[in-house]
Every structure is written in structure tokens, then in C-alpha cells.
Amino acid sequence: AQEEEAEQNLSELSGPWRTVYIGSTNPEKIQENGPFRTYFRELVFDDEKGTVDFYFSVKRDGKWKNVHVKATKQDDGTYVADYEGQNVFKIVSLSRTHLVAHNINVDKHGQTTELTELFVKLNVEDEDLEKFWKLTEDKGIDKKNVVNFLENEDHPHPE
């Protein structure tokens, strides 16, 4: 069922998305000022081109920076993107209201970090949370290495 969900017309899911949770095998990557402590604003899916554009904010050296990353779909259904190294991004579960994803990042030092991510369009459903926590557990990420972005006080303000 998960693969069928991911095969739907993704372009219609383009629009505002927000970060709820991100888990990481390398906690430094999601700590304050970390490169993957990302606050998503928008996702733009292009089925024809096989791309997804990520628009998010990240805090670097105490200042908010708006970032745009384009990922390209591969034959195996994953997406690859350059951001803080090489990334292979897989959509694990997707609906009109949630996106649960797994990202493998290899940074410029050759360090591999696995990240689990939950993004939502509206309110977080219990079922969406269950999918995220199951993936996080399956990937061996400890709950203490997960950041809740909705409850975090320090976040970018809309422009």
C-alpha cells in the first residue's frame, strides 16, 4: 500500500508544508544551528520533470537563511539532491496531509547520517505519527535524537 501511495500524482500535493519531526543517527546534524534542523515552507512536485523542490529555512551562525534544494527522481523511486553533501531521499508514506520520509546524507567528510522526517500540510494525525515513530525505530534512531519542530520556540517567522 505504501508504494501505491507514493505513485500517485505528486504535482497535486505541491504547496505549503511544515516540519513536525526530524530524527537523526547523528544528533549534531539536527541540533541548534545544525544543517538538517530545517523548517519547511513549501514543496513543489513536478511529475513531468521528475523533480521536487524543497523550500525551507535553516539557522546558521544565529541567522535564518532561506534555502532552495532541487531533488531529482531516480529509476528506483528515490530522489537525489545536493545539500550538505549527497542525499538519497525516499518517500515512505504520503497522503494529502502528511509526508514521512527517509534521507541518507553523506557529507563532505564521508560521514553517513540517516534521517527520518515527518512533514504535514494540516494537523498531525495519530496515524501519521505512528508511521513516523515506526520508521524512526526501524532505523535505530533513539527518541532522544528526535527534534519536535512544532513545539520548538525558536523558529523562522513568515516574511
UniProtKB/Swiss-Prot annotation:
GO terms for molecular function: odorant binding; small molecule binding. It is found in: Secreted. One of its GO terms (biological process) is sensory perception of smell. Its main location: secreted. GO terms for cellular component: extracellular space. The keyword ATP-binding does not apply. InterPro entries: Calycin (IPR012674), Lipocalin (IPR002345), Lipocalin_CS (IPR022272), Lipocln_cytosolic_FA-bd_dom (IPR000566), OBP-like (IPR002448). Keywords: Olfaction, Secreted, Sensory transduction, Transport. SUPFAM superfamilies: Lipocalins. Belongs to the calycin superfamily. Lipocalin family. This protein binds a wide variety of chemical odorants. Homodimer. This is Odorant-binding protein. It comes from Bos taurus (Bovine).
